[in-house]
C-alpha cells in the first residue's frame, strides 16, 4: 500500500501546489544534489494505473487512511495535494491538521503523517538517523536488512565518489520500498545588503559568520 500511495503522487505537481514551486522536485529517497554522494537514479514517475493495481491486489480499497500534518500553511497545502492525488488512485483518505504543540509531541508515532526535515551535510547522515532499523528518528519504522547492510558499507566508505556507487543501490532500495513520499526539496533563502560577502544560506540554517566579510 505504501508503494501504491507513492506511485499515485506527482512530486512536481505537489511542489507547485504545496510550495508554489519554491524548491526542486525530490525522488522519494531522501538524498539530494546537495549531498556529495548523491547518485542520480532518475526521476520519480507517477503511475496511477500501477497504483490502482497494487491497491486491488492488497484488497484495501475500502479502508480509510488518515494523513496528519502540522498546522503550518505550506505543510497543510502539501499534505492536501498529496491526499487529493492519492484519492485519484481510488484510496479513501481523510486529512487531519494538528497544532504544532500537539503534532510534535507525537510526530514519530503517527501511522501516516507529513514531517519536515532540515538538511544534513551528508546523505548517509540522514539515512542513518531516519531509516536504519531501530534508529532514533525512524518514524516510518523501516527495517530492511539489505538497506542496513548497504548503509553500513556506505558509512565505512570515506571517499564520496566511491560512496556514490553504494548510494545508488541505497536510493533504489528506499524508493522501491514505498516507505516515503518526498515530493520536493524546499528552497531556503537569505537576504543581505550589497557588499556583504560569504553570507550564503546554509542548508541546515546554521550561521557561519566567520566566513562573512565586507567589501571595502
Predicted stretch roles:
Residues 7, 24-57, 74-77:
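Structural transition elements
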Residues 82-85, 89-92, 108-117:
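Alpha-to-beta junction loops
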Residues 13-18, 56, 101-132, 174:
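Pocket-flanking alpha-helical
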Residues 1-34, 77-78, 174-182:
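Periplasmic-binding protein-like
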Residues 3, 7, 12, 16, ...:
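Solvent-exposed, polar/charged alpha-helical surfaces in well-ordered, non-transmembrane soluble domains
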Residues 3, 92-103, 126-194, 216:
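Extracytoplasmic/peripheral linker and loop segments enriched in polar/acidic and small residues
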Residues 62-71, 93-96:
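Short, well-ordered beta-strand elements
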Residues 190-216:
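Long beta-strand-rich cores associated with HINT superfamily self-processing modules
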Amino acid at each position: 500500500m505504501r508503494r501504491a500511495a507513492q506511485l499515485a503522487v506527482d512530486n512536481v505537481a505537489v511542489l507547485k501546489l504545496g510550495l508554489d514551486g519554491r524548491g526542486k522536485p525530490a525522488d522519494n529517497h531522501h538524498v539530494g544534489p546537495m549531498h556529495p554522494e548523491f547518485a542520480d537514479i532518475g526521476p520519480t514517475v507517477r503511475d496511477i494505473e500501477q497504483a490502482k493495481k497494487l491497491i486491488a491486489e492488497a484488497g484495501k480499497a475500502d479502508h480509510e487512511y488518515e494523513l496528519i500534518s502540522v498546522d503550518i500553511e505550506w505543510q497543510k497545502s502539501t499534505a492536501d495535494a498529496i491526499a487529493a492525488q492519492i484519492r485519484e488512485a481510488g484510496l479513501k483518505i481523510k486529512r487531519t491538521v494538528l497544532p504544532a504543540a500537539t503534532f510534535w509531541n507525537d510526530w514519530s508515532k503517527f501511522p501516516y503523517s507529513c514531517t519536515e526535515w532540515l538538511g544534513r551535510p551528508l546523505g548517509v547522515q540522514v539515512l542513518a538517523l531516519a531509516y536504519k532499523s531501530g534508529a532514533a528518528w525512524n518514524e516510518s519504522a523501516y527495517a530492511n536488512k539489505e538497506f542496513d547492510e548497504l548503509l553500513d558499507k556506505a558509512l565505512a566508505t570515506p571517499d564520496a565518489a566511491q560512496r556514490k556507487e553504494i548510494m545508488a543501490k541505497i536510493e533504489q532500495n528506499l524508493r522501491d520500498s514505498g516507505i516515503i513520499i518526498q515530493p520536493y526539496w524546499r528552497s531556503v533563502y537569505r537576504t543581505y545588503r550589497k557588499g556583504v560577502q560569504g553570507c550564503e544560506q546554509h542548508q541546515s540554517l546554521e550561521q557561519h559568520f566567520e566566513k562573512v566579510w565586507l567589501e571595502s
